[in-house]
From Swiss-Prot:
Membrane topology reported for the UniProt record: Lipid-anchor
Protein name: Outer-membrane lipoprotein LolB
Lipidated positions per record (S-diacylglycerol cysteine): C18
Family: Belongs to the LolB family.
Species, as recorded: Pseudomonas fluorescens (strain ATCC BAA-477 / NRRL B-23932 / Pf-5)
Biological process, per Gene Ontology: lipoprotein localization to outer membrane; protein transport
Gene (name only): lolB
Major localization listed first in the record, in broad terms: membrane
Length: 205
């Protein structure tokens, strides 16, 4: 009797766990979901990095390419774009609730939301708050997502909040498998990130 109850309880617990996992993420593709969860847990703990690379942006009113520098220290970020991006260099810095945008030959602007700043000053509807997750090859945790895994159980693509994100290559840096090339499409905006240098660092414990 005890064994039967234990089996029934374990089965119910398993179903509850699967339901909880699927409530936020729908996973498909070639990869192993268990390996994906391990990979995801490792990257979720990565809260510091420096990125150097290139960015290409195609928007209804302006398009161009330039260089990308991104410094992340837990909830603080410093993202710099420079080169022929149509509007010159731009620097976005801040943390949740306190964000500043500096645009060459225009000035400095502040807001509680990075999305609001970019849309008002540059005309880009870009989910900046999701980018810290997407750039690591992870879905943002606060909304539903549809994931496709590659043969290594890393993200090949994800769909979230009206955006399609594709990952075409990864490299291993300091024990982390991190994206090298990312394409984002949504809200009349196409963005390509080519990451030349990843310097990942786990800061918090």
């Amino acid at each position: 009797m005890f064994l039967r109850h234990f089996i029934v309880f374990s089965f119910i617990a398993l179903l509850a766990g699967c339901a909880g996992f699927g409530a936020r993420e729908s996973v498909q593709g070639q990869g192993n979901p268990a390996q994906w969860r391990l990979h995801k847990d490792q990257l979720t703990g990565l809260d510091g990095w420096q990125i150097n690379g290139k960015i290409g942006i195609r928007a209804p009113k302006d398009s161009g390419s330039g260089t990308l520098f991104w410094l992340q220290r837990q909830d603080y970020y410093d993202i710099r774009l420079s080169g022929p991006l149509g509007r010159g260099a731009a620097r976005l810095t801040g943390r949740p609730g306190q964000v500043s945008l500096e645009v060459a030959n225009q000035g400095r602007y502040e807001s509680a939301s990075p999305e609001t700043l970019l849309e008002e000053q540059l005309g880009w509807k870009l989910p900046v708050s999701h980018l810290a997750w997407w750039v690591r090859g992870l879905p943002a945790p606060d909304s539903k997502s549809r994931l496709t895994l590659d043969g290594d159980s890393h993200l090949a693509s994800l769909e979230q909040d009206g955006w399609q994100v594709e990952y075409s290559s990864y490299s291993q840096q300091n024990g982390y498998w991190l994206p090298e090339r990312i394409k984002l499409n949504g809200s009349d905006l196409d963005v390509t990130l080519v990451i030349k240098e990843w310097l990942p660092r786990k800061l918090g414990q």
